[in-house]
Every structure is written in structure tokens, then in C-alpha cells.
């Protein structure tokens, strides 16, 4: 893989467009919200937000991007069920 914000191929991490500290765990496991980022972009540049925004709109389109942002504003209403977590566990074999 490669970093979605700078193209680096080493020290990749799960970069969250909407940071985990800003939301419930819902966004931690949202597959649109999580993309490969290198340590520099994810941590040192605090997500490299401008480049990440351009990536998100380019890959998923403005409608999906806007939906994700809107969900973040109402995240207190979104609480994943245990079955959602179990489905992800099975999918990723963790």
C-alpha cells in the first residue's frame, strides 16, 4: 500500500479522516473513514488534513464525503451494535 496523502510506502498506519477522539468507535471502523497513511502524515502532520480531504473527495466523491461529515456532526446518535463489530471481526479475521 501507499500513503493516501503523500504516496509514501513505508511506516503505514490506519489514518482516520475523522479522528477517533472526535467520535464514538463508529468512525474507527468505518471503511471509508480509515485509509493508509504514513507516520509522518498521520501523526506528525496530524492527518495532513488538506491532502486527506482532496483524497477523500477524489476517491469517494463529494456526496459520500458530505455524508461522512454530516454523520460526524450527529455522531452521538450513531451507536454501532455488537453485530457490526462481529461482522468486521469476521471480515478482517481479527
Feature locations, PLM:
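Short Cys/His-centered divalent metal-binding micro-motifs
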Residues: 11, 33-60
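Short flanking/linker segments adjacent to small metal-binding domains or redox-active Cys/His motifs
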Residues: 65-94
Amino acid at each position: 500500500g501507499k500513503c493516501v496523502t503523500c504516496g509514501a510506502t513505508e511506516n503505514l498506519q490506519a489514518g482516520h479522516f475523522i479522528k477517533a477522539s472526535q467520535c464514538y468507535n463508529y468512525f474507527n471502523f468505518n471503511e471509508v473513514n480509515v485509509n493508509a497513511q504514513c507516520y509522518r502524515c498521520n501523526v506528525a502532520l496530524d492527518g495532513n488534513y488538506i491532502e486527506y480531504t482532496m483524497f477523500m473527495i477524489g476517491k469517494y466523491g463529494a456526496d459520500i464525503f458530505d455524508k461522512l461529515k454530516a454523520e460526524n456532526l450527529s455522531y452521538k446518535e450513531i451507536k454501532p451494535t455488537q453485530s457490526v463489530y462481529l461482522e468486521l471481526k469476521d471480515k478482517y479475521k481479527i
